[in-house]
C-alpha cells in the first residue's frame, strides 16, 4: 500500500491523538462514553439523503448498485432511459447533479420550523461520491457536479439557526456496492485504484456473514479511517452516524481507533461527541444504539435513536414516493420519546437542491404540533412506565411502515419538572379519557402512582378540562378538544 505524504502525516496525527487520550482504542476505554446532554434533550432530528442517486430519482437510493444488476428494474430503466451501462455509467450522472437551486439557509430554516433540534446530512453514501470538499479523492461535490462544498454550507446554515450539526458516513459498504458492474460490459472494470469512484468494487458478500471473504484489505480500511477522520476534523460534527457494514470483523480495530480519535477530538473541542451505530457494531455503552425504521417495544434505560424516512419506500427523492402522514410520524415520535429514544426523520431533496413541497408540508405540520406540545417532548424523561393501553406494537428494524391502529385507551407518558404528560394517541370524539395509571390507590405498597395532582390542563387549549380521580383512574372530560394528532394532558403534581 502506497501512501502520499499527506496520508502518512494524517495517520501519524491520528495515532498521536489516540495515544494522548482520554479515550484509547479499546472497548474498555471507550466504555467511558456518556451520551451528550444536548442529544438526550433534543429528541427530534432531521436526516438528509442527497447525492448523485437523486438525479435518476428512480426507486430508491440503491440505484447505483441496482443499475448494474442484470434484470433489476433499475438496470432495465437505466438502459431504456440513458443507454447501456458501458456507454452511460453511474459516474455520468455527475454533470447532471447541479444543485442549482440549493440554498442551505432555506433548508435550515425549514428544519427549524419543523421543530428539529439537530440535522444529519449524509457526507458519503454507499455510492462513494463525497458531498464535501476532500483531500483524499477528486470524486466529490466540490470538484465535480455542483462544485460546492454542500456539507460545509449546511453546517454553517444549520448552526446559524441554532441547530446542532451532525453527519453520517456510509462508506463502509462501498467495498462491494458497485461490484455487479464487473459482471457484464459496463464502465466498471479493472484497473481500479484507491481514489477512483468505483474502487474497489469487490464481490458482494452475504450481509449476515460478519467474517465474509474477500476480507476488506488494509488499504481499504486505511482509506475508510482517513475519510472518516477528515470529515471529523474538517466539519467537527456533534455526532456521527454509521450504517450497517461496520459490524464486519475486519472493521473492528479501525472502528475502535476512529471512535477514540473522534471522542478525543470532542474533548479537545470542549463538547462531547457521539457515534450512532447499529447491529452491535460497537460495544454496548460506547455509543448510541440505533434502530432503522423501527423501535423497541419497551422503554430502555439507555439513550437510543430510531432513524426512519418521511417516505415508506425510499430514503432519497424519487418520483414515486409513498409518504407517511404527519399523524403517523408524530405517533412514532411520541412513542419513541416515551421509551427514552430520539427520532431521526429523513427527507430526500431533489437533485436541483429543492425540498419537495409534500416534504415541506409534512415537516411544517410536525413543527406546528411540536410548537404547541414541545414541553412534553424536548428535555423530557421517561416516566415510571412509558405506556398504557391495549394495542401491541411491533419492534425491531423495518417495522414502521404501517400506522399502528391506536385507540383512545393508548396513552404515552413523559415527565419534566413537576409535570407528568399523558399523551393520548387517538383522541375520542366525546372528549372523555381515563388515564388508568393515575388512579387513586389505598395500598401504598403497590408500585404505582401515589402522588397528588394539583392541576390538569390540555396543551394548546385555554379552556380547562373537568377531571376527577378514583380507583379506576384519572377521568378527564374535555369535549372542546378536537384533533387528529396526539393530545397532551399535563398533570401538575404537588
Each predicted region: which residue ranges?
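Mature catalytic domains of secreted/periplasmic carbohydrate-active enzymes
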Residues: 2-494
